């Protein structure tokens, strides 16, 4: 049986050797290049493949059409994945008639996801194991072919458990692979209701929080001990690593973080104390706890912490161009809630940000980005993070004023990008969901989806291609000149202060604002092409929280990333949005102040937008990058967003009426 294998790490070597022992014909092996930032204590899949005379590749994107075609030409009967770090797309999974199988380091359905070996130790589990399962388009969710349980001893650390799992995998594969070869597997579906999920771990996750129970910290030490990066704490500004520990409950309670003893080195925790058996200073050598205490200058009664004691950090300076806009004013509000940020803003108006003008951390100048280029360059040089939020982003303007869209959205923003390169400043650039155009994917993926636009005579695409070209320019500057950047793509953000009713009166607004104007004025709601187009509507509070986390950029996770920010659960057609809005309007306490509902009216897009318009049937984001980089998921349901948005505009109208009797 011909197999194509995707493998890495010791488990990859174990899987390949087991396949060879079982008599499989391995046509090719796909692996990863070694990361220079990792401790390479494990076996090399590439070396094993070369020694066995098997072709081996390490592509950056194995799901690229070129690699899919090469694998198709190999005509594999079966696929195997052994600790390969990237998900395989459906096109690859469907290439093997006998199916695709993955070896996972836990007892599925528990601990789906990344680093299960470390997580079971962190959580103090008494057993784990390995699972061979069929691969489906959902990670770690396919039917189970075989499982092998591994007991976790009280003295097991990451490396000893890793070795146990490798041994268990050898035993499991020795039985399961011949069964697959003979077509005699007994598979069972997973109980998805029992599934648990764990995410990728980083060195920062090894931080010791002395406010936690001693057993919790001991489990963390076991989970990340050598050859993993280790659990760590700080004595003043000096970092130290703990390699081995034990829990002590035989000592008087003390304030968490207090050094109870230096020989042996014992530190008080919330419940019990942690004895540091072995460890090292950040640039030192492996040593016993008592010697570590000497190296750190610790004495009994001293207090150590989970963070370094350092001088007060300067606030991060954030430059927001277009600060009075929908995203800009909400982002300003969120940044001012955190004392770590100072905001510099430019816009042609200040009505939406007037509530911030008295803040000592908010510095505003009224101006136009096409005129105040010297001010902008000076503040790019002065600030740490730049967000150019100025753009014409309403569909009717794409056909009505295409050249103005190009001049502002592309040409003016290109100047800002080049200044960020010149002064080595981080740019967070607002791309758009429009760049995906007429992509046919079910979910638009930042890294794999094609960007599909219409013909030249459909000028509505000038906004999309202007943004797309800027995305590509920024990416190129990042690649060639190390520009620090993150591209974020909002998917139909809604909420208070989205456009205004005056803009809606001339057709230059987003959909919900136009619909609200129709209700307020008692004019028919116009449904373009019947309102069948589907969008995923995202509450502004969800969107801003994601954007705030991009600015935070913990551990640099957002550097060089493209991140969709949208709510795939809030998918609805424009007609459904209008019906939901109407229902909210009819039950609103201010309903009696407005005219009767004038009904729906279907219109052709060319009549409403002009002949240069072309619509998009659906626009649904994949948010895997947002989950991975930001630990973010949207929370607000669509109806709540619609209610808040409607309420804001109706009360705005009320205020205007009160001032103009």
Curated annotation (Swiss-Prot):
EC number: 2.1.2.13, 1.1.1.305
Residue numbers marked as site, Raises pKa of active site His: 140
Region (Dehydrogenase ArnADH): 314-661
Membrane-spanning intervals of the chain: none
Amino acids binding (6R)-10-formyltetrahydrofolate: 114, 136-140
Sequence positions that bind UDP-alpha-D-glucuronate: 393, 398, 432-433, 460, 492, 526-535, 613
Keyword annotations: Antibiotic resistance, Lipid A biosynthesis, Lipid biosynthesis, Lipid metabolism, Lipopolysaccharide biosynthesis, Multifunctional enzyme, NAD, Oxidoreductase, Transferase
Positions annotated as active site in the UniProt record: 104, 434, 619
Keyword Oxidoreductase assigned: yes
InterPro entries reported in the protein's UniProt record: Arna-like_SDR_e, Bifun_polymyxin_resist_ArnA, Epimerase_deHydtase, Formyl_trans_C, Formyl_transf_N, Formyl_transf_N_sf, Formyl_transferase-like_C_sf, Lipid_A_modif_metabolic_enz
Family affiliation: In the N-terminal section; belongs to the Fmt family. UDP-L-Ara4N formyltransferase subfamily. In the C-terminal section; belongs to the NAD(P)-dependent epimerase/dehydratase family. UDP-glucuronic acid decarboxylase subfamily.
Alphabetical list of HAMAP family matching this protein: ArnA
Protein name: Bifunctional polymyxin resistance protein ArnA
């Amino acid at each position: 049986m011909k197999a194509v294998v995707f493998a890495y790490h010791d488990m990859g070597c174990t899987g390949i050797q087991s396949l060879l022992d079982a008599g499989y014909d391995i046509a090719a092996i796909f692996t990863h290049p070694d990361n220079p930032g990792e401790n390479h204590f494990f076996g090399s899949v590439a070396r094993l493949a070369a020694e066995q005379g098997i072709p081996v590749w390490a592509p950056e994107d194995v799901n690229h059409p070129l690699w899919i075609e090469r694998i198709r030409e190999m005509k594999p009967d079966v696929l195997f994945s052994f600790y390969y770090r990237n998900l395989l797309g459906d096109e690859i999974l469907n290439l093997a008639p006998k199916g695709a199988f993955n070896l996972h380091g836990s007892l599925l359905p528990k601990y789906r996801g990344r680093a299960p070996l470390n997580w079971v130790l962190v959580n103090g589990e008494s057993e784990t194991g390995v699972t061979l399962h069929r691969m489906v388009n959902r990670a770690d969710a396919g039917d189970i072919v075989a499982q092998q349980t591994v007991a976790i001893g009280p003295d097991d650390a990451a490396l000893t458990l890793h070795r146990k799992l490798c041994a268990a995998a050898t035993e499991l594969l020795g039985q399961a692979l011949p069964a697959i070869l003979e077509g005699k597997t007994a598979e069972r579906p997973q109980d998805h209701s029992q599934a648990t999920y764990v995410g990728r771990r980083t060195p920062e996750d090894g931080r010791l929080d002395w406010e936690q129970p001693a057993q919790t910290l001991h489990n963390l030490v076991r989970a990340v001990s050598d050859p993993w990066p280790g659990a760590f704490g700080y004595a003043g500004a000096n970092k130290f690593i703990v390699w081995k520990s034990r829990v002590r409950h035989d000592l008087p309670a003390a304030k968490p973080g207090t050094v109870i003893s230096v020989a042996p080195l014992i530190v008080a925790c919330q419940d019990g104390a942690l004895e540091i058996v072995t460890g090292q200073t950040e640039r030192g050598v492996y040593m016993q706890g008592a010697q570590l205490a000497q190296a750190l200058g610790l004495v009994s009664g001293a207090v150590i912490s989970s963070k370094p004691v350092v001088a007060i950090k300067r606030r991060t300076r954030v430059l927001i161009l277009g600060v009075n806009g929908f995203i800009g004013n909400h982002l300003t509000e969120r940044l001012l809630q955190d004392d770590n940020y100072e905001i510099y803003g430019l816009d042609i108006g200040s009505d939406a940000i007037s509530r911030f003008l008295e803040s000592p951390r908010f510095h505003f100048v009224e101006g136009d980005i096409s005129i105040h280029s010297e001010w902008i360059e000076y503040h790019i040089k002065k600030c740490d993070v730049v967000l150019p939020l100025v753009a014409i982003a309403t569909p009717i303007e794409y056909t009505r004023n295409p050249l103005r869209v190009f001049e502002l959205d592309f040409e003016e923003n290109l100047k800002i990008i080049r200044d960020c390169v010149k002064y080595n400043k981080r740019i967070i650039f607002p791309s758009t969901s429009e760049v995906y155009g007429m992509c046919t994917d079910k979910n638009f993926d930042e890294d794999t989806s094609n960007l599909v636009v219409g013909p030249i005579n459909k000028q509505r695409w000038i906004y999309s291609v202007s943004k797309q070209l800027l995305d590509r320019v920024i990416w190129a500057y990042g690649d060639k000149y190390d520009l620090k950047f993150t591209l974020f793509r909002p998917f139909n953000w809604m909420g208070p202060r989205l456009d205004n009713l005056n803009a809606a009166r001339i057709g230059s607004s987003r959909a919900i604002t136009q619909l609200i104007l129709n209700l307020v004025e008692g004019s028919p709601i116009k449904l373009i092409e019947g309102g069948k187009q589907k969008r995923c509507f995202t509450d502004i509070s969800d969107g801003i929280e994601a954007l705030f986390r991009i600015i935070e950029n913990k551990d640099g996770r957002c550097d060089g990333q493209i991140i969709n920010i949208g709510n795939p659960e809030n998918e609805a057609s424009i007609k459904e949005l209008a019906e939901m809005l109407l229902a909210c309007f009819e039950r609103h306490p201010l309903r009696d102040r407005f005219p009767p509902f004038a009904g729906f009216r279907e219109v052709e897009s060319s009549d409403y937008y002009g002949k240069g318009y072309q619509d998009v049937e659906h626009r649904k984001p994949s948010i895997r990058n947002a989950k991975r980089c930001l630990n973010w998921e949207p929370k607000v349901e669509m109806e709540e967003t619609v209610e808040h948005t409607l309420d804001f505009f109706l009360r705005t109208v009320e205020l205007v009426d009160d001032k103009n009797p």
